[in-house]
Amino acid sequence: MSATDRPVRLTLAALGGQGGGVVADWLIETARREGYIAQSTSVPGVAQRTGATIYYLEFYPRSGVDAHGREPVFALMPQPGDVDVVVASELVEAGRMILRGLVTPERTTLI
């Protein structure tokens, strides 16, 4: 991995019971099948009671691993201004992601 390469960073913002964890698992499995190194973590709210939950995913192409086979070390939590894609299940979740600084006009696509 060169100094200029970086993983693709995606955040899913959902409420408990909306299937955010299932979607995160699908995306990770799909990325791995397509040759990416992938990781997901979650920042659970009160998910069982429709509370806000953030799923954070990072993907890096296996072909980008350096000649020594060192894989990238991924982050455990999204950082403001460093997320490429935010998928929000509801408008209020999109607003929360904007307020947390995870959506920026320079980098982020908000879905």
Task: Give the ranges of each region predicted by the language model.
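Active-site cofactor/cluster-binding pocket
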Residues: 1-111
